[in-house]
Amino acid sequence: MIMSGFHIGIYTSICLYIPLPHLEPWIISSHTPKNLNLLDCLLYCSVASYTAIAYKFCTARLIQSERTRENIMGGKLLPAAAFAGSAPPLSQVATSAAHGEDSPYFAGWKAYDEDPYHAVDNPDGVIQMGLAENQVSFDLLEAYLRDHPEAAGWSTGGAGAGSFRDNALFQDYHGLKSFRKAMASFMGKIRGGKARFDPDHIVLTAGATAANELLTFILANPGDALLIPTPYYPGFDRDLRWRTGVNIVPVRCDSANGFQVTVAALQAAYDEAAAVGMRARAVLITNPSNPLGTTVRRKMLDDILDFVSRNDIHLISDEIYSGSVFAAPDLVSVAELVEARGGDGIAGRVHIVYSLSKDLGLPGFRVGVVYSYNDAVVTAARRMSSFTLVSSQTQKTLAAMLSDEAFAGEYIRTNRRRLRERHEHVVAGLARAGVPCLRGNAGLFVWMDMRRLLLGGGGVGGELRLWEKLLRQAKLNISPGSSCHCSEAGWFRVCFANMSLDTLDLALHRISRFMDTWNGTKQQASCQQQEQQ
């Protein structure tokens, strides 16, 4: 029996649309080759039928693999829930609640995303005051790139540092030498030349988030603990715990001394960890502090270094706002103290995190730094940095920018002045509204005191109810202190550098209006109480 591929193709195609019981008589009577006996015809039809069935099966498998959730008939995607029941379980990391996305810190962001303020399109929307982003000096960066287009561009022919080929191919995972050298110089410059940094001890990461997590992986094992003074950056719950399995033990500080950490508080946290079987592996501080907007005093830094040495643990100093200190006292970097203490053996315990997200206002570039005086830590960090690389083009552009001494110096001075002016503007506006703030000298935020407004008997519950009112009524996303693990309820972090001055003034007006409403309600309640008496 001889059958052409043409015939099989026709029969296969027809079988896709016509049920086989109706199809086979039609094939036999009308479209079988001539001079075939009955057996040949039966074989012929069987081949065509099974070819069609096989085609159907293979097509179904192909559709399932390449268009898993697509409804072919309707051209629509089926809901993910339709497939979830048959899927095997995910890992403990994937399903862990340690990410902290249920925190008010992240919930406020979601509320903003659903109803973002826009001066024209949505003037009654939520104003984002929960994002520590520096946009006050973006014009300086844009002007530099406009005047130096070669920094961000490349040539399309040949090879060399400025060529497309050189940027596109694999680079040293440790980072471009030119960029590490420029970064080391910039880190020293923003500290007033009081500390020096070795480019060979710099390990690049995709932002400070990756740098902090990388150090946690290196210094601690799952089940160990990091000691962190409160209040602290809400993202640490995600960055340090979620994937590492490491615990955070809060070092409780309070407003009596401006939330400055004390040796007694450090020891209490260390003992608390030991009491539940957790081994403390490091103290992590932010200097300048997020969310306080303050710097750590030299005496306290010395005390912390003595504490980690005495207890044989490490110190991580997150200094991503080190170039954003705009008022006295000046920043004292732990790098200064390491150099001053010389050969007392402390250097191997000290690790610094830095980033260009805050001081340079470039969070989208994802550039972070692990700087360690410990060679073993540097080696381990380099090995792990392959999971969190910075693109060659980003490094090339920033190497040119930071190597320009005149530009870098002018940027630092202008940015500090603008941040100081913004800070003073916000503090004055809040004071007019009757809201005091902790005295700050750094960062992109103020630490606002609304303890007297606490609802429902105070405490964290009262703070969250107040936060909800600020979010839903005043349409302001402001981070509550409880999301920063503050030991006192009623404090809020207010960011001021991520918006225009007009938007900031509107936000201050909304706070003032909110306070007027609260004062009126309080006065009315007081009058009613007097009448009852």
From Swiss-Prot:
Record SUPFAM superfamilies: PLP-dependent transferases
Induction details: Induced by submergence.
Lyase listed as a keyword: yes
Entry-annotated residues carrying N6-(pyridoxal phosphate)lysine: 358
Signal sequence bounds: none
Catalytic activity line of the entry: S-adenosyl-L-methionine = 1-aminocyclopropane-1-carboxylate + S-methyl-5'-thioadenosine + H(+)
Keyword list, A-Z: Ethylene biosynthesis, Lyase, Pyridoxal phosphate, S-adenosyl-L-methionine
Domain of life: Eukaryota
GO biological process: amino acid metabolic process; ethylene biosynthetic process
GO terms for MF: lyase activity; pyridoxal phosphate binding; transaminase activity
Needed co-factor(s): pyridoxal 5'-phosphate
Pathway where this protein functions: Alkene biosynthesis; ethylene biosynthesis via S-adenosyl-L-methionine; ethylene from S-adenosyl-L-methionine: step 1/2
Alphabetized Pfam families for the sequence: Aminotran_1_2
Tissue expression as described in the entry: Expressed in shoots and leaf blades. Expressed at low levels in leaf sheaths. Expressed in vasculature of roots and shoots.
Family per record: Belongs to the class-I pyridoxal-phosphate-dependent aminotransferase family.
Summary of the function given for this chain in its UniProt record: Catalyzes the formation of 1-aminocyclopropane-1-carboxylate, a direct precursor of ethylene in higher plants.
Protein name: 1-aminocyclopropane-1-carboxylate synthase 5
